Amino acid sequence: MLRFFQPRLSLRRHLPGGVDAHCHLLPGVDDGAESAEEALSIIRGQQALGLRGAICTPHIMARYPQNTPAYLREQFAQFTSIVNRQSSIGNFRLHLAAEYMLDEAFPRHLASGDLLTIDPVWLTQPQPPNLNIPEGLGVALAETGKSNIQNSTSSIGQSTQQFLLVELPQYLLPPGWQDMLDSILAAGHTPLLAHPERYLRILEEGDLRALAARGIALQGNLGSLTGYYGSRVKAIAQSLLADKLYTTFGTDSHSYGMLRQLKLTA
């Protein structure tokens, strides 16, 4: 009941570029949108909130063995062809990345070199005062107002340094997880840890701050700031935000219903 009465969170402040940097709207590939119709509903919901684009971040993990980069690119191409036929949606920019679980299969994914990364220019935002942009990415972000990429899966025009969105299990730290983060850095990418504030059972807030100090970028869930995941998660998210430790935010929407429940406003 308390969640219903909470004030709505302004996206203009937390997504100044108008791009949802984490959502599961690519239909039928993971625990997100189940159909193209539902995915289109999510996009319309994002547009109603004033968003101009989204980065699709389907899971790559053992639970979804079919989710190889090649398969996801194919599914993304099919979905964007559907989106482009929707006159009501208009010029909504879609990009494809992935959310990689740091599990036993991750070292093989990284070694393959075929990764679905996030290009900083996709965020289409100058560096806002409440976000922490790692050194080397600020210039790319400052140039994003000139970007006109749409429905992109290509590496053409990408910035040199890329974000690789990764996540941890909620209940148990995997063996070698810090070594995996180091290997991402060694490969020339910036690890972008998804929803760090939600890892209450496995990491303390001090651990998150230590990761940020090591060059690990943090991506918050907007729902964490509205109390969607509970008061403890909200408190950690507010603390990290106050100290400018977040690099990006995303809705992490898995359905249109979830997007509505996040209590967001333009």
Walk through the language-model features, giving the residues of each.
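An N-terminally biased module of ancient metal coordination in phosphate/nucleic-acid-related enzymes
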Residues: 1-86, 90-91, 134, 150
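Extended substrate/RNA-proximal surfaces in nucleic-acid metabolism proteins
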Residues: 2, 66-141, 148-216
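Hydrophobic faces of well-ordered beta-strands that scaffold small-molecule active sites
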Residues: 19-23, 54-56, 94-98, 164-166, ...
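Acidic-and-aromatic substrate-binding clefts and catalytic sites of carbohydrate-active enzymes
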Residues: 33, 63, 172-173, 199-203, ...
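Non-catalytic positions within long, well-ordered alpha-helices that form the structural scaffold/packing
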Residues: 47, 185, 241-242
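Short acidic/histidine-rich active-site segments
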Residues: 59, 246-262
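His/Asp/Glu-enriched short active-site or ligand-binding loop at hydrolase and phosphoryl-transfer sites
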Residues: 215-227
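Short active-site-adjacent structural elements
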Residues: 226-230, 237, 256-262
